[in-house]
Amino acid sequence: MILSKKGLGLEISAEGLSLALASGGKNLTVQGGLSVALPPGTLQLSRREPNVLNAAHFVSAVREAHLRLLTKERAASVSLPDTVGRVVLLDLEARFRSREEGLDIIRWKLKKSFPIDLGAVQLDYQTLDERENGAVSLLVSLLSRPVVAQYEELLGEAGLEPRFIDFTSFNLYRLFSQRLEMSEDAAFVCFYRGALTVLIFFGGVLSFYRTKETPGEAQNLYRELNSSLLVYRDRYPGQAIGEVFCMASPAEAEPFRALVAETTQMEPVLLDLERAVALGGGTVMDKNALHGLSAALGAASRSL
């Protein structure tokens, strides 16, 4: 009997922990999952300082959640809120001869923009586009080393092996990537756990990224989305958005879709998680519980 490979994803947020077990690669199947709240005072999200204030409570919560998932899989892909790090889209004039050379050039380039000690930052990058003249477009992520080190240490104590650490916005994109990649000039707009995220692609390449925590009232969301679109259009006047996709919780989905339609003056495609994934045999989950696993499922898919 051939056993299908399974991926384990863990989302850490201000609301608590979400663990998801998935299989199937592009055709993602949910094999199990759960969300748990953390005791008050356990976590305080920060870009610079270690986030976990009560290590014992955090380790206990992770260990118990993993035990309840009834899996032997310990290698986990971890999703953190975008607010604990930074994301930069960077254009450079030449390709790198090696990844290390790339990291050195990126650090040098970023010194002018970020008044922080880049030596205390874990920096990673992904090449988005390579042009014929040798120029490259990069997606650069930055996380404080003390923040990463603490999470890795405590997750290890809880019995997990952190494999990848990524931001929630990209794990949400990863969850719907099969549909989103069918449209080359598209905007992905989501409101998830109090954060509004806007990703805009042109020619299949990520051209714009913005995420901001904001109250969920319609006027706030409208203002933030409109501001993002104004910045994008001012920066790239010749790059029209061809299609808009949106995502929100089941209760907020339809009002959010209407708000995105009003702001963009386009009819958006409302992404439905129940259509994007399947439930494995014996797995029972309602819409709200499944939505709460969104980022964890996106993270889990990275290991498949």
Walk through the language-model features, giving the residues of each.
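Hydrophobic/aromatic-enriched cytosolic interaction surfaces used to assemble or bind macromolecules
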Residues: 1-304
